[in-house]
UniProtKB/Swiss-Prot annotation:
Annotated protein name in UniProt: Mitochondrial translation release factor in rescue
GO cellular component terms, semicolon-separated: mitochondrion
MF GO annotations: ribosomal large subunit binding; translation release factor activity, codon specific; tRNA binding
Segments of skewed composition (Basic and acidic residues): 149-184
Extent of motif GGQ: 74-76
The organelle targeting sequence, given as a residue range: 1-98
Region (Disordered): 132-184
Organism name: Mus musculus (Mouse)
Family as reported in the entry's similarity comment: Belongs to the prokaryotic/mitochondrial release factor family.
Assembly and interaction partners: Interacts (via C-terminus) with MTRES1 (via S4 domain). Associates with mitoribosomal S39 large subunit, peptidyl tRNA and nascent chain.
Entry keyword annotation includes DNA damage: no
Length: 184
């Protein structure tokens, strides 16, 4: 059975499979935080980001690229190799550091995507698709918070009504002389 027919059995859209499949099989990717000038974000946060066709293209002559030694978890293999990419957009002064994978090529691609988004936000501001998505995510978060608050208030009201009805039932039973263990 070919790998193509195996994926067909899962009935997932092909673009989703390409995004989510990797070295270790299918995995869910969480939505990353959005990037704005001055806002710090690790490259791990931007792993599953959508591609925006309307972003400003990067001119390779305006970029300075360096490869430095990595850091963090992974032990000596990570700390000895120079697979961490530092990419600088000279005109804007934006610097991106990417050490998400052990592969230099993958880190270069990820760094360019992140830099392209940051440069687009830097030059286009509120008109940038990245900025628009950030605003939409904030709106959805506010709506979820509002719904959760309303649900909590309804639950509190229901609890108060239950307690009030139990108190009335107990008072009525006390007035009728029925022992508490024999109430309905």
């Amino acid at each position: 059975m070919s790998s193509r027919s195996t994926w067909a059995l899962l009935r997932l859209p092909l673009p989703l499979i390409r995004i989510c499949s990797g070295k270790w099989g299918l995995r869910l990717q969480e939505k990353p935080a959005l990037l704005f000038p001055g806002m710090a974000a690790s490259t791990v946060q931007v792993a599953g980001r959508k591609d925006y066709p309307a972003l400003l293209p990067l001119n390779e002559s305006e970029l300075e690229e360096q490869f430095v030694k990595g850091h963090g978890p992974g032990g000596q293999a990570t700390n000895k190799t120079s697979n961490c990419v530092v990419l600088k957009h000279v005109p804007s002064g934006i610097v991106v550091k990417c050490h998400q994978t052990r592969s230099v090529d993958q880190n270069r691609k990820i760094a360019r995507k992140v830099l392209q988004e940051k440069v687009d936000v830097f030059y286009n501001g509120e008109n940038s698709p990245v900025h628009k998505e950030k605003l939409e995510a904030e709106r959805r978060k506010r709506e979820r918070k509002k719904r959760a608050k309303e649900t909590l208030e309804k639950k509190k009201l229901l609890k108060e009504l239950r307690e009030a009805s139990q108190n009335i039932t107990e008072k009525k039973a006390d007035a009728d002389g029925i022992p508490r263990g024999f109430q309905e």
